[in-house]
Amino acid sequence: MEAVQQNHSVCRGYCGVMLRSRSGGFFRRGFMLGNVEVILARPRGFCAGVERAVRTLESVASRYAGTREVYALHEIVHNLHVVNSFKKMGVKFVSALHEVPEGAVLVFSAHGVSQQVKEESRRKGLTVVDATCPLVTKVHLEIQRYDKSGYQVILVGHKGHREVEGSMGQVSNPVVLVQNVQDVQSIKIPSAAKLAYVTQTTLSMDDTAEIISALKLRFPRIVGPDLRDICYATQNRQTAVKAMSQMVDVVLAIGSKNSSNSNRLLDLAKAQNARAYLIDSYRNIDLEWLIGARRIGITAGASAPEILVQEVIDYLGLHANLKVRTMDGVSENITFKLPELD
């Protein structure tokens, strides 16, 4: 929906401004959507690992502002708003180490990196700050422990995801990746091999349950981590969006298209509610999605900041008489200590 004329700071109610929808129809700004209840998912948005990574990069950018160049290997988290905010602070995002000059400051993203990347960073004399999520680091340590004990490690995850790439590079021996039940049936493992599995942290217990069951069925002696090692944030957000989606007419999931966990929230919302949309910000909202809706649910991926949620609420308030409440759910009080800066 784009405005022929709009003034967000002035127009808070019925302003008589005509809006053009993406399909070409016109609507009048104001309370065109009538009375609408907005239900906010609990929990939503930043998890502790993302919060730690963002605060770490903020600290690094502030400390070295004007004195040394600060680089981040890949996006610090998968969110366009966050990345653009850091670019404005002068942080340079790169996709490979050869783009980082010797002697620069380099921050590893929340998704973690391989041992090879760490070693190459040392050889280049970089000042490295590791913002890897502690739960990802825990998976790395499990892979190393299993490998040292003679196990063939199987990783349940998505090919090409930054976290998976880093996890598979923790040991010199090959780590076998399985993405689905079909992979479990097709992988070739020596019958005498000791097997252990780990999982990508941004997959919930629900996401991995079928694959793990298939692994245990085919390899009855396979071992794996304690269920408490599953990322709490992924599970909590998925549980919340499934419950919220049953309460509302439309779901708006805030997150970037390259965010694995945000896309999963969208999938789960669609499974419960056909009217569900992934948006980077309020600017992506087409008001035609919301016509006839009396309850709108809002969730946000683990890498989406709360400011984006508030901006969506403010935008909806331009077009409806809003009542906003937060659903009952899990309250997360976990924080991770920031890495020390030299």
UniProtKB/Swiss-Prot annotation:
The active site is at E163 (proton donor). One of its GO terms (molecular function) is 4-hydroxy-3-methylbut-2-enyl diphosphate reductase activity. Isopentenyl diphosphate binds at H78, H111, H161, S259, S260, N261, S303. It is an enzyme of class 1 (oxidoreductase). Keywords: 4Fe-4S, Iron, Iron-sulfur, Isoprene biosynthesis, Metal-binding, Oxidoreductase. (2E)-4-hydroxy-3-methylbut-2-enyl diphosphate binds at H78, H111, H161, T201, S259, S260, N261, S303. Pfam families: LYTB (PF02401). PANTHER family: 4-HYDROXY-3-METHYLBUT-2-ENYL DIPHOSPHATE REDUCTASE. Belongs to the IspH family. This is 4-hydroxy-3-methylbut-2-enyl diphosphate reductase. It comes from Anaplasma marginale (strain St. Maries). The lineage of its organism: Bacteria, Pseudomonadati, Pseudomonadota, Alphaproteobacteria, Rickettsiales. The gene is ispH.
